């Protein structure tokens, strides 16, 4: 598991980007990868853990958990 900070997240569109704390490019984050019950959304500057995986358009955050 890696950690990072939510750069931005659009709850209406269901996606945003996470900046990894270890450095590197921002990662795409889709609401379907958020490990939570109910309405799945993230807030700007929120700390999260995640796993980087290859998505259809390149690396993306999966198994996102709010810390």
From Swiss-Prot:
- Known CDD domains for this protein? CSP_CDS
Q: List locations, semicolon-separated.
A: Cytoplasm
Keyword Transcription set for record: yes
Domain CSD, first and last residues per copy? 4-64
For this UniProt record, the keywords arranged alphabetically read as follows: Activator, Cytoplasm, DNA-binding, Transcription, Transcription regulation
- Annotated GO MF terms: DNA binding
A GO CC annotation recorded here is:
cytosol
From the record, give the transmembrane residue ranges: none
Q: Which InterPro entries match?
A: Cold_shock_CspA, CSD, CSD_CS, CSP_DNA-bd, NA-bd_OB-fold
Output the SUPFAM superfamilies linked to this UniProt entry. Answer: Nucleic acid-binding proteins
Give the main location: cytoplasm
Q: What is this protein called?
A: Cold shock-like protein CspA
Source organism: Bordetella pertussis (strain Tohama I / ATCC BAA-589 / NCTC 13251)
Where is the organism placed in the taxonomic lineage, from the top? Bacteria, Pseudomonadati, Pseudomonadota, Betaproteobacteria, Burkholderiales
